[in-house]
A protein has these predicted regions:
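N-terminal Rossmann-like NAD(P) cofactor-binding subdomain of oxidoreductases
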Residues: 2-198, 232-234, 267, 299-300, ...
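Charged docking surfaces used in two-component/phosphorelay signaling
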Residues: 10, 75, 165-342
């Protein structure tokens, strides 16, 4: 899907390389032996000159600027929507294919919103030279639901998320740790990054959207429909942040146009791409957990069961590392599709 240089000669730029997702992007490129002749680490001026480990050596962070993308084939962006809006078109004009992890381009009709396990062919049409990486909570949900949607067509999804603090960045995880220490010692915790105490607490920290929903919840509604190619799918999300460092969890109720049993859902999920299925009778602690998912690639699916109140509907529990499949891994998988190495 890339024109010009062969894949073995691909030059990759990582924008926002010093952030939590940017660092994970570098680790993912290395771990998956992505075929790059050169990797460029880009960030703001205050991060320029930093050294980042890569393939047994170090990359020196360069300051992001208008000329940063000369000779770059693929630019992985994870520096926020403002940076992506400004520099995404610059990178694309310089000849790079942009894979953007921010919310800047996701709902643009000329920008594909891709999850490789769900809609890999969407990236073939990219008139702006930009491909959007979906929101972390959306990615893991659609990976788990796509096999079910193909079999019985989803009518309505009700999802409650339990999202890790790393989704808010390095500073959020640091504040969580300091708050836990303070609370354990009987002191009042410092509250700067979050709008409220996060230690020993659950709450939301996203901006308000429309109709009483947060922006995060609206992302899940709109992105799910776009990725799955079906605007008729109903999505009812409630998103909260929990005092976990890494790993988002989701309780999901799904209704279908054609009734689907839990037994059939398990058959469909076994061996589905990107999924690790946790089966067996319910037992305390036997479900997928963020602590076990952290630092791993799969989307873990468990607690698959028939809904006792709604015949033909099922409930399931979905967990994934939000920095990996929820961000960096998905972006690198898109890059692999571009160079034909997936």
């Amino acid at each position: 899907l890339l024109t010009g240089e062969p894949s073995a000669m691909t030059t990759v730029a990582v924008v926002g390389a010093t952030g939590a997702v940017g660092r994970e992007m570098l680790r993912t490129l290395e771990r998956r032996s992505f075929p790059a002749k050169r990797v460029v680490a880009l960030a703001s001026g205050r991060s320029a000159g930093q050294k980042l480990p890569f393939k047994g050596s170090e990359l020196t962070v360069e300051q992001l600027g208008p000329t940063s993308f000369k000779g770059v084939d693929i630019a992985l962006f994870s520096a926020g929507a403002t940076v992506s809006k400004e520099y995404g078109p610059i990178a694309a004009a310089a000849g790079a294919v942009v894979i953007d992890n921010s919310s800047a381009w996701r709902m643009d009709p000329d920008v594909p919103l891709c999850v490789p396990e769900v809609n890999p062919k969407s990236i073939e049409r990219r008139p702006k030279g930009i491909i959007a990486n979906p929101n972390c909570s959306t990615i893991q949900m659609v990976v788990a639901l796509q096999p079910l949607h193909q079999a019985a067509r989803i009518k309505h999804i009700v999802v409650s998320t339990y999202q890790a603090t790393s989704g808010k960045g390095h500073a959020a995880v640091t504040e969580l740790h300091s708050q836990i220490k303070a609370v354990a010692a009987g002191h009042a915790p410092s509250i700067e990054v979050f709008p409220h105490q996060m230690a020993m607490n659950v709450g939301s920290d996203w901006k308000a959207g429309q109709h009483g929903y947060s922006e995060e919840e609206l992302k899940m509604i709109n992105e799910t429909r776009k990725i799955m190619g079906d605007d008729s799918i109903g999505v009812t999300p409630t998103c909260v942040r929990v005092p976990v460092a890494t790993g988002h969890s989701e309780a999901v109720h799904v209704q279908f146009h054609q009734p689907l049993s839990a037994a059939r859902a398990l058959e469909l999920l076994r061996g589905a791409p990107g999924i690790e299925l946790v089966e067996g009778e319910y037992k305390p602690g036997g479900e997928p957990q963020p602590l076990r998912a952290a630092g791993t690639d799969p989307v873990y699916v468990g607690r698959v069961r028939d809904d006792l109140a709604v015949p033909g509907a099922i409930n399931l529990w979905i967990v994934a590392d939000n920095l990996r499949k929820g961000a960096a891994l998905n972006a690198v998988q898109i890059a692999e599709l571009l160079v034909g190495s997936s």
